[in-house]
């Protein structure tokens, strides 16, 4: 596969020479995701995917077909986006993809934790799964004795997974550095059936691949799929997808950009690993949850009924209210956000604390509106400074296109747009998010205008409805079931869980509870003294240092980080996602 793509991109250049050099390099698909170490790269596709035999053969067949029909042209390339591996049965004139059975059919999806994971890894995995569950109809259930088709999370040498359901035990590696919630969300997205965003057939409309800066033998990692290989369920391309490559994916020096957004204001948006975007969620809901809600969709501004709770709307970022009719509530100790009316005179918005510096953990949402025949002009003023990173982590986001459900321009660092920006319609959404740094912030002004704006295609309308109830009412739960056995015998390394059943169509609250368990410290490993003593031998075979001190240090019963042994019990002052017994 790599050799064919290399030949198509570079002609007579010798692949084996490039591969020999490139195989020694670690690679990265986003600055916000840990690197893939060189010893794993021969086994992974696009940096973090284990392909099935069928998937690999389909990609090879597609490459060979393109090579035959387009020898004089250049191979199309693009960027990672959430795409499905299978097609729906109702698509006329189109067969199922070879991997149609990669869709999960049995719910809840069972998963278990390997003993290699510590409690902090487990906490972050649970947080990521809860984000998927609260926004989709997909449900997960922890079962340490799982059999049949199930996911096993383990600590491998990096972050990687498979695309879609393989059958039987299916691993997701959450190695060191992969504990970030957005990274885990990304890998679970693969397991549910999502490809990288830039793999979409329409990616080249939004992204340009700069092959001069790509590690040569990895040019294959930028190929697009055809419409016959994947389906997007008519969900638009999303430059803010958690599944998208970053700007420097597979870069020869990890600094030069290999992906350029056609709209330069999106350049620092791609590659985020914070959380799911609105269209990440919608894609999974279209694939798995279509028709779960039977009620009329009265959600506004691109929102739709939440298949996890059909009495509520899933709203695009920046929108809130019961029907997505207003601005989303802000999260800040400082007053910010609101719904504002643009008039002919300039009005001003600024970040909390401007210009003396914004606090951390701030989310502000503004919805600006004017009359329907008018537009909104926005211009930045005075000093500008937002924590700088190649993919914006802290940012001001401007949603000013025709599609306010899609991710907007995310702007950070110290160069503000010089010219005024004009919205495509009578609404504009402004989001300020700060989680990492403290910097100057921003100040902007806005007013209504009749100036023209460049527009993008509008979206198809979505209609969803609510499910038939088995018991009249809502929030009727069964009693909690019995606690499962603890996954580990000691050291506060394990968890136990219990389940309850929702007896109505909708229930608020959690289906499964977790507890950290077996908080007694683990007994001393009898091998500890041998290992410690051996590590103290000098090169000439004589004993170095003071082995007695080392032996005493490993004679205490042990606990899993971040717990410490206090009188034989494992304790910690750090806040955890999993309640302690």
Curated annotation (Swiss-Prot):
Binds 1 zinc ion per subunit. Its cofactor is Zn(2+). Glycans are attached at residues 67, 418. It holds the Pfam family Astacin. One of its GO terms (cellular component) is extracellular region. Residues 474-523 form the TSP type-1 domain. Disulfide bonds join 137-289, 159-178, 293-313, 315-324, 336-364, 486-517, 490-522, 502-507. Residues 1-95 form a propeptide. SUPFAM superfamilies: Metalloproteases ('zincins'), catalytic domain, Spermadhesin, CUB domain, TSP-1 type 1 repeat. One of its GO terms (molecular function) is metalloendopeptidase activity. The active site is at residue 187. Residues 336-449 form the CUB domain. This is Zinc metalloproteinase nas-36. It comes from Brugia malayi.
